Amino acid sequence: LPAGDILNQVYSLPEVDKLTNIVFMGQGEPMDNLDNVLRATEILTADYGWAWSPKRITVSSVGVKNKLKRFLEESDCHVAISMHDPIPSERAELMPAERGMGIEQVVELLRNYDFSHQRRLSFEYIVFKGVNDSMQHAKAIIKLVKGLDCRFNLIRFHQIPDIPLQGVDDEKMEQFRDYLTQH
């Protein structure tokens, strides 16, 4: 979408006057439309636009190498990376984008930027029963992001017809969360 159409999606919301945050997620990979995403976030944060703080905007990505680097250099908005599995071979099964720029490369790129002040780094992680919910996965996450100032958003998977994946129960989700929180 062009920047104007992106902004129109925001302006068209009935609750536009009540918005507190915007997340670029779920409508395709934002880095594949980077020029327009940057232009839209520029207008949202500029004095001549909405004059929002970049802290109110998050852009989610699977991690498209050169474009993620450019985004991090040209924007102060928060960034959320879709991880979903810390083990590259398994992540490639869930997310073909792993083959383009692996999660290990994404994390190495992120280490070059400061996320301790205004900008926040988050990782999105849909927890699938028997796929990415083991302590092996939790330990691999901790090892992968060690030293990074980041947050994890654990997302419960809701069953989709004809999709063989399942979500975890509350106990498993809490165990996984607690392990990440304690380490």
Region roles according to the model:
Residues 183:
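Conserved dinucleotide-binding and phosphotransfer motif residues
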